[in-house]
Structures are given as structure tokens and as C-alpha cells.
Amino acid sequence: MHAATGRPKIALRLPTEVMRLQRMGASFQTRISFARRLIRRMHRENWRIERLRFDLNDDGYGTALYVVTTPEHCYSLICFSHYLRPELRTDRVIAEAWDATFSLFDGIPNAADISRLAEQTPKQEAGRFQASELVLSRANKSLRIFDCVVDSLAKGTQPDPYNMSAVGYLMRTTAVYANGKFGMADRTRYTDQSALASPFQAEMLTVYLIRGFTHDLVEHLAACRDPDRAAILDRPVKRHLGIGNATGLGMAPFLISHPQLIHNWFHARETGLAKIRSIEVVTPDRQAKFRTLLARAELHIAEWSVGNDRQTARTLTLLEELQLLTKWTANGSEIFHEPVPWDALYRRAASAFSIEGQELLVSLLFEPYPGIIDDLGEALQVDCEEPFDPSLTVTEMRALVQDHYSWALAIDFTDSRESQYFWYYSEEKIEPRRGARRDEPGVEKEMKIAVAQDVQAFHVALGKTCGDETMTAFLMRSAEHRHVARRVQIGARYSYAEIQDNVISDSCKPIDILRGKLAFFGASKFDPKSDLWTRITMYQGAPLNDELDADDADDWCFPFLPMIEPCTSP
């Protein structure tokens, strides 16, 4: 087919391939990532962002207010910038103070609202909030770049491009809370507002606005230091400065705890890939667009500098694979004479590339086809919970387990390495944590995310029960299996609902789960700091607050260092 708008003739990649930690840990952003979808909506609906208040002193401490006007509603980001003693600065969840804290407010706050939030927002988890607050966040300055940028601007010059590119952001968030936490509005209160109806749009809006605040903050500090000489950031430089994020175990269980939602995410992406691979004629303009993006991606990957040896080695491999892609897709290449060219390219890459190279190709293939890909993002949310069918018999349920959870049944839990860890919820930090099962206390608080282990126990219990017995009778007697019985029914209906790996084994790297989720957010330049946490960049290259009406507002993926003249700004 010339335009892959119907059912793709190329099959979707199997869940047994896609839903493995190794592949999830090699994910990249795509056109259906949440940040990309937000920017497109902001552009399409002509959103307006105004800075209504910027009461910061010469040291950059005080309050700022940004108001976003959509066709239907207004939202406000209230920013509180604080002095932070150096010894208190940490990205870890144990922190109790930050360089800046933020609240996303439903509407435009009055003086009383701002006064109340000035008291509560800096407390973060210890604060108390109302339904008028949608998102709570905080951020710290990047010690490698923040002061350097201020120093350069104060002297009337642009920041050093290589120092800037090594980091890619001025500040990084260390938490973004929403969905009813600490008294804030539950997501169901604002899903009728089209601007925030899709998953994580309130959080993505908050992070985007924080990025703009960081730009304004460094320019303000430079102007305070030397009003006569201070420069402002050149637009290409400002666009290249995204917002960082430090993410740990807190978000990892989400992918396991929301099987139906996760199916929707991965199924949408895999449907998009199958549609692109099914295209029979790749027109010259689409070929040219792909080559342009490929060249951009090579520059972007070359600037992906991290301290993690494993990721550095993978990045070097990626650069070699991108050079091969460039050769394979050169103008006049025989690949475009294949019956289904993109499928031929993907199959060639699948046999020759690393998993990370394959997943980067998936991201690249999406870009020339907004008409095919972008609407798939409408299927990312869950509109209603899947009902549980208690009338199934034990025999029928055993068949579901064997048909859809063979990966779980294949794990040998007599090997102690397969149950090395347990996950639990820390009441002190209101965050998930991971402990060594045989060395640390708290196993009795284990979260129900050890899907493979639970499925095996469920399967054994079913095998000891009369096959004609219904789930109603079975679960009345064995209530400890209720959660997994429901899960198996969901997994049988939704093929991408499960991470098909053992998340409590000694080989599980939680950062693979994190990257799988963060790629759907729109993150780039993953910078693993251990197996348990990573830093990322969001919105690098994205249009600025006053550029959302640009014709190419969505053409910002794979950003690379802009050319910066080493001269003073006028």
C-alpha cells in the first residue's frame, strides 16, 4: 500500500520480543511520546504563555508566575526560587530542600493562593495541597553549567557551546508529583479538560514551563550582575537548553502496576512501526526527510556524552550503525526498490544492529509520516477498566496462564538468584524501594509486582483444584490470588500488558524499566548513574514559549549543538 492508513500487512513485532527489559532499556522517544504530543497540541490550538510575575531579587530568589491560556482554560505555574545551602543539594529522594519548587495551578491564582502555596510548595511531600493544584515539582541547578552560563551572559557573551552541550540543561527536576498526591487534584477531576485529558499532559506541561523559567532565571541573574553588559541567550542556544530530570526507582513499578495502560502505549507504537514497514512506495520527499533526520540523529548521538562505561560503549556502536544506515539509504539506494522498502531496511537492521540501533531506527522511521503516526497517540489512555470474569473455570484459567504466561512459567524460582530482590513501598519517603531479600528487613511489605512469581504460585494452586470450579469459588477460598487472577485475564486480552522478564532477579536492572517509560515521556540523552537511577533531558531543541506558532513547531527531535559565534551579543 502507498499510504499505510489501514490494517498493516506487515505483522506487529511480538510481545515476546518487544516486552523484554533489554529492549525496553534501549528505547527512544517517538512522535507519539507525551512531550511531542503536547507541543503539537500547543501549536495546533495556539496556546499562549505569559509571564505575569517575576519578583526575584538580585540573587535570583523569589516568586514567578507563568500563565498558559488554551482555547478552553487557563493554567498557571507558580515558581518559588530559594537559597539552598550547598551541603543540602542532592537529587536523591531524601532531600528536604531544593533550588526551586513549583506548583501547577488550575486557573489563575489570587494573592491568597500564592501566599498559601509559598508556604506549602517548598515543603514538597510534607506540604498540604488542594484540588486547585494539579502538579507539584522541584528542581536543582546543574553545578556543571548554571553558574558558567550566568557568568558568560553577565560578560555579554554566549555560553561555551561544548560545556553547554555536555549537560544540555540549566536545572533538573528531581520529582514531578500529580494525580491526587498530598491533597492535589485527582486526575479524574481534569480529564474532561481536553488539554490535559491524555496521559501525563499536566506533568509534561509543568516540565515545559519549568524549562522556560530556567532560561529567564539565568538571564535575570546576568542582568543583575552587570546591567550594562549582560546579554540574553541567543534563540538557538536557548532552544538547545532543555530541562533535566533525575529519576530513580519511584516510577519503575508504574509499568507493572498498569498493564492495560502499558499495552495501549506499546501497542500504539508497534502498530505505527507495522504501518510504516507496510508502505510499498517511499516517495523521494520521504526519502529526503529520512536522510535529513538520519544526519541530525548522528550529530545528536555524537553529543550524547555520559560517564557510564556501558552506555558509552553502546553509543559508539550506535554511531557505527548510523553510518551503515546512511550508506544503505543513500539517494538511489537499491533498498527503495524493494517491494516494501522500510520493511527491508528494518529487517536488515534487525539482523545486523544492536538492539539500541534497532530501536533508534524505529524512532527515525516514524518521523517522515505524521499523517500515519500522530493519531495513534489518541489510543494511549485507558477509558475504562477491564471487568473481571468470575465465571471462568479453573481449567479455563489454567489454559490462559499456559497460553499467555509461558514466559513466567519458564523461570526457575528454585534458583535463589531469581528471587534476589523484593520491592516495597517506603511510608517514610512515599516512594517504592528495592531490598535484598535475604539481607534486608521488610519482605513482609513486598509490593505485588513480582508477576512471574505470583503467576507460578497461582498456576500451582489452580493445578490442585477441581477443573470445573469457577473463579468465584476458587477466590473465595484463596483470596491471596485475586490480584493475579485479574491480571491474567487482562494479559490474555492485551498482548503487550506485561514486562516479560523477572523483575526480582539478580539480573534485573531497574533503569531498563525507567528508560522504557521515560522514552514514552519524550526523554533523551539517558545518563545512567547506576542500575537504580538515571538522568535524562527533556525538551532539548523544543520551541520556546513564544515560538509555539512556528510552522515547524514539531520538528525538534534529535537536537544537536547550534553554531554559536564567539562574539559578544549587542
What kind of region is each of these model predictions?
Residues 2-20, 97-172, 202-388, 405, ...:
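Mixed-charge, Lys/Arg-enriched low-complexity segments
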Residues 24-51:
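Amphipathic alpha-helical segments
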Residues 43-96, 393-425, 430-431, 472-474, ...:
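Amphipathic, interaction-prone secondary-structure segments
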Residues 64, 563-570:
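Secondary-structure-rich domain cores
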Residues 73-83, 108-120, 434, 552:
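Short amphipathic beta-strand/extended segments with alternating polar/hydrophobic composition
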Residues 196, 200, 204, 208-220, ...:
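Acidic, low-complexity, intrinsically disordered interaction modules
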Residues 508, 555-557, 567-568:
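Acidic, serine/proline-rich low-complexity intrinsically disordered regions
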Residues 558-562:
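Secretion-targeting segments and adjacent low-complexity export tracts
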